Amino acid sequence: MAMTTTANPAAITTALREDLSDIITNISPTDTVFMSNIGKAPVKGIYTEWLVDSLTTAANCAVTEGNVAVPTDGHAQTRTGNYTQIAAKWISVSDTIEAVDKAGRKSEMAYQSGLMLKELARDMEYGLINNSTSTSGATRSACGLKGFITTNDTSFTTGTSITTLTETLFNDVIEACWTAGGNPTMVLANSYHKRQISAFTGNSKIVTNMDAEQKKIILSVDYYESDFGVIKVYASRFIAEDSSDYRTVYILDKEKFQLGVLQGLKTEKLAKTGLGQIIQMSTEYTLISRNELASGAIKNCASIAAH
């Protein structure tokens, strides 16, 4: 018996509906561990400054009975600062794209704005960690952790065989921060160094965070119990590598850092000039480092296993 036309699949393909899921999958990393863990402070100019002070070294203060007063000069503060940096993104959505029926979202404008917000936050996190200088001019840039932490900076010599992050070195930097008066409570490390820290021989001191809500927000967290206090160890996706594939492990007193905000996040619809709409999302910010002595860095650590 011959097959009828309506029973022949090849003859009715133009009438078949497409099967396109309304679920959009995007696994691009968006966690901003450093920025999410520091406080915020308003700033009032494109160059914000603050004062850093220190006490004299502790010593025996006994004086002779009836001793004549011997005044000393007062403490002189050190003035430091950072330029603000403008971060902005734009997206154009045509009136037609906004009007048509779309898979996975109702409004293209709302969907693209959500993506821009995540991208902007990632860009800010990257700069807050990796920027090494503060620059003026029309295109200003804010110095990040890489540029601020200079004193408790224990670096391997790039190109030598001594490139493995060790527990002794890790604790040496924690001790240096504590000796200077800091109380480091946070470690930022890339995935490779995070695994190295978890594998320290004293790993009985490593405790996995079981706070489900906290892990949901900021991903992997461990607690390392050092001789100078308990420190949270975070895996950061945005610690940049140099040309030799070396990276930095940051040991931070997070209370000494703040996100300085000159212009908060703004989402604006720009004036229409045609058959579409341009969305502008922007913010202006800087990193405030109250006292870099409270934190430390282990630089030039190999971020891949030796071959």
Show where each model-derived region lies:
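Flexible, glycine/threonine- and acidic-rich loop/arm segments that mediate assembly and lattice contacts
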Residues: 1-307
